[in-house]
């Protein structure tokens, strides 16, 4: 059975220990952390160390910032790189496996006016390769992995599909950079989500889950047996990290996910 995790902001409780107690009772195997900007994640290091000592399982952190390593502005790119390197260091210090980030989020979409970004595709590619190389080398030095997450076309204009992420990662050529897949974005961008998982099996390092409408798994129409079956086929051994909006009673919505995924083939 595939392991499950819930992002920390979705879990009830005022401490990671309290959130972990709920998570375990609901059937989760881990908590995915959120990494805010301004080195906020590094400032939590003692809190995270105490939680780890108390048995909280925290394998991954997902970036939670307003700008990313593919930003148009050079200063924002530099800051995003520094923030991500710090998050990789912290997740390594608490025994985790890696950190997930998109190239950008909400910066530009080719599906919305003005339709043409201020930077060429060639310039985008050069900036992404430079950033991924720097982050990948830092991740390798820390013994963890950077997960590049493709986002849908309305949230990012650079990396939307797994094949685009795979091309960048193969060009970088570092084992410390892998794809972080997300079921919601794949439902929008991939003609056959299960097939594309099989096609890029060797590069998939992390997985986040929400349904076709961004609500919790079970609230939409995603073909979960096919998607989960593909992960089983490739021997995926990471977590399915819940990253979603919640519909209905939020506590019950979060509680429902592990059992739903199990019924669906996890």
Where are these regions (language model features)?
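Active-site-proximal loop/turn and secondary-structure-junction residues that shape catalytic pockets
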Residues: 10-12, 35-37, 64-67, 103-107, ...
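Conserved beta-strand positions in the central sheet of alpha/beta enzyme cores
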Residues: 32, 60-62, 100, 147, ...
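Metal-dependent catalytic neighborhoods of phosphoester/phosphodiester hydrolases
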Residues: 41-46, 77, 250-253
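N-terminal substrate-binding region of glycoside hydrolase catalytic domains
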Residues: 22-42, 62-66
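N-terminal small/glycine-rich loop or linker at the start of catalytic domains
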Residues: 1-7, 59-70, 105-116
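Active-site acidic/histidine proton-transfer and metal-coordination neighborhood
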Residues: 53-54, 70, 74-178
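Histidine-acidic metal/acid-base catalytic patches
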Residues: 1-27, 52, 95-97, 133, ...
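Glycine-rich, proline-tolerant flexible connector loops at the mouths of alpha/beta enzymes
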Residues: 32-53, 103-110
């Amino acid at each position: 059975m595939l392991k499950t995790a819930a992002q920390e902001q979705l879990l009830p409780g005022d401490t990671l220990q309290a959130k972990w107690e709920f998570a375990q009772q609901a059937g989760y195997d881990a908590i995915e952390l959120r990494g805010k900007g301004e080195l906020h994640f590094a400032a939590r290091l003692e809190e995270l160390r105490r939680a780890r000592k108390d048995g909280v399982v925290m394998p991954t952190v997902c970036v939670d910032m307003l700008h990313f390593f593919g930003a148009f502005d050079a200063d924002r790119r530099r800051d995003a790189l520094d923030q991500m390197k710090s998050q990789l260091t912290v997740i390594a210090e608490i025994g985790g496996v890696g950190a997930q980030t998109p190239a950008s989020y909400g910066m530009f979409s080719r599906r919305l006016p003005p339709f043409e970004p201020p930077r060429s595709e060639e310039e985008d590619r050069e900036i992404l390769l430079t950033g991924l190389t720097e982050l990948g080398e830092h991740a390798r030095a820390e013994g963890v992995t950077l997960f590049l997450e493709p986002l849908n076309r309305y949230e990012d204009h650079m990396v939307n599909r797994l094949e685009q992420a795979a091309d960048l990662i193969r060009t970088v050529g570092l084992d410390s950079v892998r794809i972080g897949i997300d079921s919601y974005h794949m439902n929008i961008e991939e003609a056959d989500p299960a097939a594309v998982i099989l096609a890029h099996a060797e590069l998939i390092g992390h997985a986040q889950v929400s349904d076709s409408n961004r609500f919790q798994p079970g609230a939409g129409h995603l073909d979960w047996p096919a998607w989960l079956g593909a992960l089983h086929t490739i021997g995926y051994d990471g977590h399915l990290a819940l990253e979603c909006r919640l519909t209905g009673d939020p506590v019950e919505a979060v509680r429902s996910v592990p059992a739903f995924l199990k019924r669906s083939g996890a």
